[in-house]
Swiss-Prot record:
<comment type="function">
    <text>Forms part of the polypeptide exit tunnel.</text>
</comment>
<feature type="region of interest" description="Disordered">
    <location>
        <begin position="48"/>
        <end position="86"/>
    </location>
</feature>
<dbReference type="InterPro" id="IPR023574">
    <property type="entry name" value="Ribosomal_uL4_dom_sf"/>
</dbReference>
<dbReference type="InterPro" id="IPR002136">
    <property type="entry name" value="Ribosomal_uL4"/>
</dbReference>
<keyword id="KW-0699">rRNA-binding</keyword>
<comment type="subunit">
    <text>Part of the 50S ribosomal subunit.</text>
</comment>
<dbReference type="GO" id="GO:0005840">
    <property type="term" value="C:ribosome"/>
</dbReference>
<keyword id="KW-0694">RNA-binding</keyword>
<dbReference type="GO" id="GO:0003735">
    <property type="term" value="F:structural constituent of ribosome"/>
</dbReference>
<dbReference type="GO" id="GO:1990904">
    <property type="term" value="C:ribonucleoprotein complex"/>
</dbReference>
<feature type="compositionally biased region" description="Basic residues">
    <location>
        <begin position="60"/>
        <end position="71"/>
    </location>
</feature>
<dbReference type="InterPro" id="IPR013005">
    <property type="entry name" value="Ribosomal_uL4-like"/>
</dbReference>
<comment type="similarity">
    <text>Belongs to the universal ribosomal protein uL4 family.</text>
</comment>
<keyword id="KW-0689">Ribosomal protein</keyword>
<dbReference type="GO" id="GO:0006412">
    <property type="term" value="P:translation"/>
</dbReference>
<keyword id="KW-0687">Ribonucleoprotein</keyword>
<comment type="function">
    <text>One of the primary rRNA binding proteins, this protein initially binds near the 5'-end of the 23S rRNA. It is important during the early stages of 50S assembly. It makes multiple contacts with different domains of the 23S rRNA in the assembled 50S subunit and ribosome.</text>
</comment>
Length: 207
């Protein structure tokens, strides 16, 4: 079982914590992680692109000139695709880009991402994370005490509005609850900070 240091809010070591081997100690599968990131990014696409086809462009109901006798090429509408200002053929229409990977693949991806953080010594586990009031300065001090200088993902067991608001103005810091942890967030932040309760909750779901 992988073992990591357990810290308090002051940045001092408060002992060790053993992590579940089937969640934090597997061999990371990079290809599955990549697939999961593509899936998440696809679902974030807006998909509101739209062009007008020949039936939607204004005008063009009258035949521009008679079929025969003019010496010109026959035309049925000034809004057919070959005309300037005409409709677009096979253009983009509003659609959803979202798709889902199988549940087993999604679970393997998040386990691989978590195990990578352990392997790279980028997982920090806190005994607890409690703030008396919304204080960005206090949250910044906690992160500094943990020697976190780059992007960090903070995972709490449940929704914690005080922590979320305190970290909101810190660049590169994101707060999610354990139920909302995902591959894109884990991979997109160098440091992963989890409370002990959040670790237990994640292990309960994924083990």
């Amino acid at each position: 079982m992988p073992k990591v240091a357990l810290y308090n809010q002051n940045g001092s070591t408060a002992g060790d914590i053993e992590l579940n081997d089937s969640v934090f100690g597997i061999e990371p599968n990079e290809s599955v992680v990549f697939d999961a990131i593509l899936m998440q990014r696809a679902s974030l696409r807006q998909g509101t692109h739209k062009v007008k086809n020949r039936s939607e462009v204004r005008g063009g109901g009258r035949k521009p000139w008679r079929q025969k006798g003019t010496g010109r090429a026959r035309q049925g509408s000034i809004r057919s695709p070959q005309w300037r200002g005409g409709g677009i053929v096979f253009g983009p229409t509003p659609r959803s880009y979202a798709y889902k990977l199988p549940k087993k693949v999604r679970r393997l991806a998040i386990k691989s991402a978590l195990s990578s953080k352990v392997n790279d010594n980028n997982l920090i586990v806190l005994e607890d994370l409690n703030l008396d009031a919304v204080k960005t300065k206090e949250m910044a001090a906690i992160l500094k005490g943990l020697s976190i200088e780059k992007k960090a993902l903070i995972v709490t067991a449940d929704a914690n509005e005080t922590v979320e608001l305190s970290a909101r103005n810190l660049p590169g810091v994101t707060v999610v609850e354990a139920n909302g942890i995902n591959v894109l967030d884990v991979v997109g932040h160098e440091k992963l900070v989890m409370t002990k309760a959040a670790v237990e909750k994640v292990e309960e779901v994924l083990a």
